[in-house]
Amino acid sequence: VSLISMRTAKVTVMAVALLNVSISANAISFFKKKKQNKNTTAVVKKDAYERILTEEKTDSAKGPFISLYRTNEKLLVELPPSSIGRDMLIGATISSVSAPQFSELGTRAGSITHIRFVEKDSSIVMQAVNTEMLDALPTTNAKQAEEINYRNLDFFSFPIKARNKKTGGILFDASSFFLRESKYFPVITKVAGPYRVDADLRPEWIKVTELKAFENNACVKMERNYVTNMSGNSGNVAISNYPVSIGVQFTLTLLPEDKMIPRLSDTRVGYFLTPKSIVNDSLIEHTSFINRWRVEPKDPEAYFAGKLSDPV
C-alpha cells in the first residue's frame, strides 16, 4: 500500500468521525430544544374586565345586586343582568363636617331619588323614574300617551368599561356621579344666614374612605374638601378661601319587585304626604298618598276576621 493511500484513508476516517460528532451534537441540541419547548408555559391574555381590576390596586365591596370598586382614583360599579332595569332608591347624607354653618350633620344632601339603571348603546344610564301618573288599568292608547308625556328622566350617563364573561355583569365608570359635585345632591348650603355661599370642589379633593355592599343595599363613604367664600347682598366678602371638609355617604337600596299597596291620605294630621295624579274613568284626578312603613299582616284572612296576625 502506498504512502498516499494510507494518508487518504486516515483523512477519510477523521472526516467520518468529525461528521458523527457533529450529528450527535446537533441531535442533542435538537432534543434539548424540544424538551425546553415542552416546559414553556403559554401566556394567558387578560380581557378588558380582568385588566381593569387587576393591573391597579383595587378596593372592592361585592354584593348580589351591585359591586363597587375603587381603582386608580376612579369609582367603578358592576351590575349583574338581574339588576338592570330594577327599581332602586339613592340618597346622600352628611356624615361629618368641619364647619356646621356650611352643612348640617345628619341631614340629607338633596332628595331621595327613585332610579333605574338601563343600558343604552355603549353606556349605562341612570334614570330618574317618573311616577307622577298612576293608571291601574291603562288602555293601549292611554299607556302610549302616558309613556310619552310622563317619560323617565335620563339622570346620568356612564361609559361601559368592560363585561364580566362569567356572570354577564356590566362594569362602568361612575366617577362623574360620585366624585363630582351634583346640583341634585348639593352638599354645601347655598345660604348661611344673610350670606351667600360659593364653594369650589375639585376631583383631587375627594377621597373615597369606605365601600360596603349587602344583599339589597350598598353605600359609598367619602370625604370632600371645599374652598368656600361667603358674601353679603351688597357684595361685601365676609369669608374668603375658607377650607371646609365634609363627609358624605351615598346609599343605594334595591326596591322589592312586589310593590306595596299605597294608602290615600285623609284629614288626619301628622303624616307626610306625596302628591300624585290618578287616572279615573278617563279623567285625571289629583290626590296624595301617606308616606308610611310597609307593615302588612302575615295572615290577611285572620286579620280581616278580627284576629291577631304578626306583621311582615
Q: How should each PLM-predicted stretch be described?
A:
Residues V1-V13:
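Bacterial N-terminal signal peptides that target proteins for export
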